[in-house]
Amino acid sequence: MLEALFLGLLQGLTEFLPISSSAHLRLAGEFLPKAGDPGATFTAITQIGTELAVLIYFRRDIARIAAAWLSKVIVRKEIPGSSPQDVRLGWMIIVGSIPIVVLGYLFQENIRNTFRSLWLIAIVMIVFGIILGIADKFGRSERDLKSLSSKHGIAYGLAQSLALVPGVSRSGATIAMGRILGYRRESALRYSFLLAIPAVFGSGLYELKTAIGESDPSAPYSLIETFGATIVAFIVGYAVIAWLMKFISTKSFMPFIIYRIVLGMTILLLLASGTINA
């Protein structure tokens, strides 16, 4: 149980930072007594905890967007005080979620196996760290969420799909795309949080249903241990969101970029020396 709780802590600490939580869980598994990959199922279910933190932290934004979208699209009647921008943002969350739903379904076997190679994780940690660094450095910071278009939503969605490979980082990829498109850091980060909700809940609930219906005796952690890790991820994740929103209002992503590159190089050295297995 302690191992699972530790991984839940790690999930909460890293999910929203552009450093890839799935890569950290995959790597940490190599150093724990139950050494090995915690698995895509464990990772997806614990991410439900961190997304619950998003729902609570952004509850007013989400409630406003959902109410405006439902009243306009389903009820066909605008509610007093609703904004066309909220309706549009609701559509952009849906549009931006399409790529990861399609690609996640098509590549689900690769997600469970091939994509979890530590060699691949180390390389993409470095490569996407450099990409995020360039995007953040030269991004124009002239757009906010009012500028979101269908093309930008799809671009964000394609970037999010890259995070199907551990090491890319969902937030890192979407933030980099936002900066490339000229969005301010706070706007890119906020949309990144909102965009992740459908994808993460969809993946997590699917894996949870599978885990309950098809018990896997080879799984390193039981459902009880996984649920415990999910609760820890929720608590820690909420604190990280609050900290990150304040941090990014005055700072750049450079500390995370340096960390990604250093960690990626460290993983390569550990693999090359035989200290850990891919």
Where are these regions (language model features)?
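Multi-pass membrane proteins that catalyze or facilitate reactions on polyprenyl-/lipid-phosphate substrates
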Residues: 1-278
